[in-house]
Amino acid sequence: LNYEYSDLEPVLSAHLLSFHHGKHHQAYVNNLNATYEQIAAATKENDAHKIATLQSALRFNLGGHVNHWIYWDNLAPVKSGGGVLPDEHSPLTKAIKEKWGSYENFITLFNTRTAAIQGSGWGWLGYDTVSKSLRLFELGNQDMPEWSSIVPLLTIDVWEHAYYLDYQNLRPKYLTEVWKIVNWREVEKRYLQAIE
């Protein structure tokens, strides 16, 4: 991480982050590495059935790692600019205003759609390189958009482990608070790379 566990307080506690990053995310990394090893062994043995049965574990753990990796970079301590929106003349601001009218409208829609995910999942803001537009996604479990044309700009984790220690069952409250530590500089950097 680019910050200490305590740096995101009071929005996310060090206690929560130590479990979320140190245990949950690490488990995805460990399981992903184990799955790669099993696939390599099955490939060496020419065991197509075993390779096929490992695909769901590969997808789940790779998604868990990638979604979390993006999420951690999407957060920043308030003292380091977390929660500070991009300049009103920035390309990202223009794109968000063109699509949703304002950051407030965007955040309200993002939160409404993401809070409605049944069970665990992720809210995503992505840039579609084909339609040249911003898109919102609500994705279950550790899924990611299926289209290779989608560049991830922002992910918000709504698995219970992302908020339960601090917010209990109040997912909407967590979604409201997390914007106070969104690293908009990182989101904008990804957007600028995507539109090149």
From Swiss-Prot:
Cofactor(s) demanded: Fe cation
Domain of life of the source: Eukaryota
Residues holding Fe cation: 20, 68, 157, 161
Family annotation (Pfam families): Sod_Fe_C, Sod_Fe_N
GO cellular component, one term: mitochondrion
Enzyme Commission number(s) from the entry: 1.15.1.1
Molecular function as annotated in GO: manganese ion binding; superoxide dismutase activity
InterPro entries: Fe/Mn_Superoxide_Dismutase, Mn/Fe_SOD, Mn/Fe_SOD_BS, Mn/Fe_SOD_C, Mn/Fe_SOD_N, Mn/Fe_SOD_N_sf, SOD_C_sf
Function: Destroys superoxide anion radicals which are normally produced within the cells and which are toxic to biological systems.
Protein name: Superoxide dismutase [Fe]
